[in-house]
C-alpha cells in the first residue's frame, strides 16, 4: 500500500468519467432518455473536474467555481422557455468554447521547445475562440436579436476575416517548423487571438436562422474536440 500511486486511481476515475460522458451523450439522441443522459453526462464531467483539479489548485476554489456555475446555469435553465432551448444551448456551448480558449491561452507559456504541445495549443485556441464567438452569433440569430442579412456589408467583411483567420492558423502552425519564433512573436500571437474571435463571427454570420441547429451541432462537436 505504501507504493500505491494516486495517479492509477485518477486514471481509473478518468475512464469511468469518459464512459459516463459518452453514455450520456448517446442517450441524448432519444427523447425518452435525454433527461437522464444529460444528468449522466453532468456527473461524468463533475468527476473529471474533481480528479483533474485535486492536485493542481485549492479544492475549495474548484468547488466554489462548480457551485457558482451550477447555480447560474440552473437559474437560466429554469427561467428559459421551451421554445428558447436552442438559444440557451448555443449560449452555454459558447461559454464552454471560451473556457477552452482561456485554458489553451494559459498553457502557451509552457510550450517552450515542445513542438507538439505548441501545435496543440494553437489549434485549441482556434477551436475554442471560433466556438465562442460563433455560438454568440448563433444565439443572436435564433433569438432574433441579430438581424444582418447574408449580403450585408458587415457579413462580407467578417467572411473575409474568417478566411484570414484560416490563413493565420496555418501560419502559426508552420512558423516553428521553418525556424525559431520571431522576436515580435507576442504581438503576432495577440493578433492571432483577435483574428480567431472575429473569424468565428464570420463563420456563422452568413448562415440563415433555419440552419442554426446544424451550426450549433457543429460548434458543439468542435468544442468536444
Segments from the language model and where they lie:
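Cytoplasmic-side transmembrane-helix entry/capping segments in multi-pass membrane proteins
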Residues: 35-44, 62-65, 84-96, 149-161, ...
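C-terminal ends of transmembrane helices
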Residues: 20-35, 70-89, 135-149, 199-212
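Transmembrane alpha-helix boundary signature
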Residues: 52-63, 75-86, 101-115, 174-181
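Helix-loop-helix hairpins and the membrane-proximal interhelical loops
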Residues: 40, 47, 146-194
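N-terminal transmembrane signal-anchor/hairpin module of polytopic inner-membrane proteins
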Residues: 1-59
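Structural signature of hydrophobic alpha-helical transmembrane segments
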Residues: 4-18, 55-71, 117-132, 182-195
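Interhelical loops and loop-helix junctions of multi-pass membrane transporters/channels
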Residues: 82-157
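Helical transmembrane-bundle signal
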Residues: 14-27, 45-52, 97-103, 107, ...
Amino acid at each position: 500500500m505504501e507504493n500505491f500511486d494516486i495517479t492509477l486511481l485518477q486514471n481509473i476515475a478518468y475512464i469511468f468519467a469518459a464512459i459516463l460522458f459518452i453514455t450520456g451523450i448517446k442517450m441524448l439522441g432519444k427523447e425518452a432518455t435525454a433527461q437522464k443522459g444529460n444528468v449522466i453526462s453532468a456527473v461524468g464531467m463533475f468527476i473529471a473536474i474533481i480528479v483533474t483539479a485535486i492536485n493542481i489548485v485549492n479544492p475549495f476554489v474548484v468547488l466554489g467555481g462548480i457551485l457558482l456555475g451550477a447555480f447560474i446555469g440552473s437559474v437560466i435553465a429554469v427561467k428559459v422557455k421551451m421554445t428558447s432551448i436552442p438559444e440557451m444551448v448555443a449560449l452555454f456551448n459558447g461559454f464552454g468554447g471560451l473556457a477552452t480558449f482561456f485554458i489553451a491561452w494559459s498553457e502557451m507559456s509552457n510550450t517552450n521547445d515542445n513542438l507538439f504541445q505548441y501545435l496543440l495549443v494553437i489549434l485549441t485556441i482556434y477551436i475554442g475562440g471560433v466556438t465562442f464567438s460563433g455560438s454568440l452569433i448563433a444565439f443572436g440569430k435564433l433569438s432574433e436579436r441579430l438581424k444582418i442579412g447574408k449580403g450585408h456589408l458587415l457579413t462580407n467583411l467578417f467572411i473575409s476575416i474568417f478566411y484570414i483567420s484560416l490563413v493565420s492558423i496555418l501560419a502559426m502552425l508552420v512558423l516553428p517548423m521553418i525556424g525559431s519564433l520571431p522576436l515580435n512573436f507576442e504581438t503576432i500571437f495577440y493578433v492571432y487571438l483577435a483574428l480567431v474571435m472575429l473569424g468565428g463571427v464570420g463563420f456563422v454570420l452568413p448562415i440563415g436562422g433555419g440552419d442554426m441547429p446544424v451550426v450549433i451541432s457543429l460548434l458543439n462537436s468542435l468544442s468536444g474536440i
